[in-house]
Amino acid sequence: TQADAQKQTTSITEKALKVNDLLAVADQRVNDTIVFQGPVKHTCSHSGRRCFISDPTDETTIRVEVGGNIKSFNRELVNSEIAVTGVLKEQRFSKEYIDKWEKELKEEEAKGEKDEAHCDSEKNSILKMREWMKKNNKDAYVIYYVEGIDYDIVK
């Protein structure tokens, strides 16, 4: 019934973490099934295979990949509040990986294989990763994302 569905959604959203709360404990929750919620900032319009859930300031996002009962994310979800159930994953970029990326970028730039705007964007990403690693005394830059299982639109 609709009342049962509403109760289920309410119980999901009551235990759902906000983006910043999830990121604060992410290193301890990798490979755990988690529930979090927030507004959809962006959906990938070509494939619909991922969306990005933001914190209240729109400065921090977590990527959600399709999986489980989620077949795609449609554009109509943008600006909707959703509660996502999924498995928290991490992608690690070691210092060595970043060094190699930077070297390859410089070589491509020297050969004229990439346009300036693309190179500037990648250089900025590399710089931000290095700054974060230095500030946090880490030997790798970690990006957390969620392999989706299901989601509910929060009323």
Regions inferred by a protein language model and the residue ranges of each:
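OB-fold and OB-like single-stranded nucleic-acid-recognition modules
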Residues: 1-155
